[in-house]
Amino acid sequence: MKKHYLEFLRILLLAQIFFFSGTNLVSSEDNTYFLTSESLLTYCQSNLPAEDGICQGYLAGVTDSVYSGHLGDFISICVPKGVTTTELKTLFISYAIEYPEFFERAADGLFTDALASKFSC
């Protein structure tokens, strides 16, 4: 339990660093989202711990929003208990590589598509 809690805190801290750093963000003048699918893919493929944390934290947040936010009203996704953020990262990388035409989309959209393709109810 303690190991999972510490891992969660690490990912949360790294996600906060990402949000406050402003790197690889899309200008709010051009779009209403902050992270493109291509930018998220770059983070997810990185060997740097901070960027890996940004990736996994973002994916965990989107996955949580499916259940606690409005996304659950529009899509039917049932992520099995026990799926790790590392597994979510692997799913996103393979899906994003398969659909490069969506790189300029908001990252949550492409990842939600990946979740729906793998974990449809």
Give the role of each language-model region.
Residues 93-121:
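Short, compact, well-ordered microdomains
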Residues 32-94:
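Short N-proximal segments of mature Sec-exported proteins
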Residues 2-12:
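Bacterial N-terminal signal peptides that target proteins for export
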Residues 10-22:
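Bacterial N-terminal signal peptides
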Residues 23-29:
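Sec/Tat signal peptide C-region and signal peptidase I cleavage site
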